[in-house]
């Protein structure tokens, strides 16, 4: 456990005799504390203790003459040190935004990758969250997997990724965080009055021409959003070129 202050509970085989004393030790019997458990309390024990380091809890009964019954013992570990592993090179497999590292994507199903500063301990657990720490999922990354993390996640809306290590005692290391945007809604802007500057065919609007270099003109149904990109293809969509048309261009 990572918590020193505890409530110790136990069930006695019988109620204490009138002059019996219940004693508890948190340091393997080196010192004992008399508990105020009395005959009228029945067989259920509940008492406050404070653990220290790695040791054993002992519980015993001492009678009025000083005779001591057999102690029940339970080893414990108090660990209050959080894992110190950190994370670098956090990435998702399908970052479809304007930059390959902006964590803006249209794809919910992702592979999350990261590099750990050290291999995790045998009892440590790697955890991930896709909703800013609202819920955590234990990953099957093990000590033998080294420092390279690769795990499947499913993004939802706009939130923050968290990655952290939790040890066997429940201590939690510092989380690495990365905001992301999942946007699955396609732009609805349409185009009218599409034209080229030099249409040399039999009609000025038949798009037959003997001129390769053209100025393409069109009217958008609305101004593009601040982060939208207008793209143009001249080969039936096989390849696309980003245009410098901006929000203020109307």
Where are these regions (language model features)?
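Extracellular beta-sheet repeat scaffolds used for adhesion and glycan interaction
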Residues: 4-5, 9-58, 96-103, 108-162, ...
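Flexible, low-complexity linkers/stalks enriched in Thr/Pro that connect modular domains
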Residues: 2, 72-95, 176-199
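Conserved structural position at the C-terminal beta-strand
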Residues: 61-63, 165-167
